[in-house]
């Protein structure tokens, strides 16, 4: 019986080593990446305070405050949003819904009549008209939450982690960097946002804003390389969750 137990233990360990080889290579290469990396963050295992069976809990979505042009303010006096088949949720508990391709809002908009928060969703993304970046107005995936304040509207983008990471990679180091450098940036970005505590945005339950105070986000449209790097690191971290022992090999 003891020999059988030893045999299976060795078998599963070898299997874990083989399947996790590529992931460990990615993490190990971080130590050799040039200090020219624009996000100067220590590379550590991406974990949160809430640890369960695997010891790691993944953030599925992040919430990012979208600042005005030139990062001068978090407040927007007026907004025009565009997208294919936008859905606008408003009223108490978002009870009302309206479909459209374009919506304009300011602090006096009827959408804010019974609530100070409006949620907007676009399946293929949402464009903020006039919100210019290096390559034109960015497209925001996920949902935009608009909070009415005395100084203007605060915009929070709730987005899947991988879409966020891809848009950070393209904005921080560019789409043309080598894939291994993009992967390393993805690890940096994931680690940073999972540990970020933006106390100034606690009211909006936001993890960060899109400026250099945190991580530059969605200023340059992510391409296939940034998306590939974000996805590969996601798969690596999932494997490390399934086989935590790989983190110590």
Residue positions per predicted region:
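Conserved, single-site charged/polar hotspot
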Residues: 2-249
């Amino acid at each position: 019986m003891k020999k059988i137990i030893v045999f299976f233990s060795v078998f599963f360990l070898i299997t874990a080593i083989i399947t996790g080889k590529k992931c460990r290579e990615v993490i190990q290469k971080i130590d050799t990446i040039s200090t020219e990396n624009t996000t100067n963050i220590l590379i550590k295992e991406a974990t949160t305070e809430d640890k369960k069976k695997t010891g790691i809990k993944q953030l599925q979505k992040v919430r990012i405050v979208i600042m005005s042009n030139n990062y001068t303010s978090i407040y927007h006096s007026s907004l025009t949003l565009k997208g294919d088949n936008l859905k606008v949720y408003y009223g108490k508990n978002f009870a009302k819904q309206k479909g459209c391709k374009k919506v304009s809002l300011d602090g006096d908009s009827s959408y804010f009549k019974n609530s100070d928060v409006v949620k907007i969703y676009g399946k293929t993304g949402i464009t903020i008209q006039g919100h210019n970046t290096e390559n034109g107005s960015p497209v925001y995936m996920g949902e935009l939450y608009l909070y009415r304040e005395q100084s203007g509207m605060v915009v929070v983008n709730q987005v899947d982690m991988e879409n966020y990471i891809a848009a950070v990679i393209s904005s921080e180091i560019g789409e043309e960097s080598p894939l291994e450098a993009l992967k390393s940036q993805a690890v940096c970005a994931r680690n940073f946002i999972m540990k970020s505590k933006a106390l100034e945005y606690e009211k909006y339950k936001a993890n960060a804003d899109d400026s250099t105070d945190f991580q530059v986000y969605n200023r340059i449209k992510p391409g296939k390389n940034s998306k590939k790097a974000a996805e590969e690191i996601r798969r690596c971290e999932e494997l490390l969750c399934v086989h935590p022992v790989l983190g110590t090999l």
